[in-house]
């Protein structure tokens, strides 16, 4: 999938946890694709959304291994990056995530991410979770499929 075509007409983009991990930790597997997504969203002034649970998912491993520098790097990234908003889990998001879990058999974190994307009006969802492609209410963009 060509990124510029996949994001054509997208004004609100949701980014799942894994792209933030690849980017912040400079993980080579999908770093080029993630950098391209961030560059595209910044150049095209696309509102980018993620959930507050993203920070929790990102810092769990660094906390486990006492990597306070990496924890701080994540916190700085989410506080200072332009055009990226963190959305709290509301009652509506929680209820919608339950519907998604019931309909698609999603794990709770995945359902919360997708529910947040839907409730905030996102047209596309960037992830590396191939299993999420079964969700039909939203355009699911897989990092591993981007060129």
Regions found by a protein language model. Give the residues of each.
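Short loop/helix-cap segments at secondary-structure boundaries that form the rim of catalytic
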Residues: 130-138
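Short acidic-hydrophobic, aromatic-tinged amphipathic segments that line or gate anion-handling sites
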Residues: 86-89, 140-145
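Conserved glycosyltransferase catalytic-site signature
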Residues: 17, 52, 110-114
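Active-site neighborhoods of divalent-metal-dependent phosphate/nucleic-acid chemistry enzymes
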Residues: 2-4, 84-126
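Histidine/lysine/aspartate-rich catalytic loop segments that bind and position anionic ligands
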Residues: 54, 81
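An acidic/histidine-cluster motif and surrounding catalytic segment
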Residues: 77
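Short, well-structured N-terminal submotif of metal-dependent ribonuclease cores
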Residues: 1-50, 63-72, 130, 143-147
């Amino acid at each position: 999938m060509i990124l510029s075509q996949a994001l054509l007409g997208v004004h609100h983009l949701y980014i799942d946890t894994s792209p933030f991990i690849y980017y912040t930790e400079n993980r080579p597997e999908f770093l080029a694709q993630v950098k391209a997504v961030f560059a595209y969203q910044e150049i095209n002034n696309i509102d980018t959304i993620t959930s507050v649970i993203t920070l929790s998912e990102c810092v769990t491993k660094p906390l486990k291994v006492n990597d306070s520098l990496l924890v701080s790097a994540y916190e700085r990234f989410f506080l200072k990056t332009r055009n990226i908003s963190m959305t709290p889990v509301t009652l509506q998001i929680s209820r919608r995530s339950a519907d998604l879990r019931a309909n698609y058999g999603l794990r709770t974190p995945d359902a919360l991410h997708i529910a947040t994307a839907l409730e905030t009006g996102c047209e596309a969802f960037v992830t590396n979770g191939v299993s999420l492609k079964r969700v039909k209410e939203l355009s699911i963009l897989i990092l591993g499929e981007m060129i």
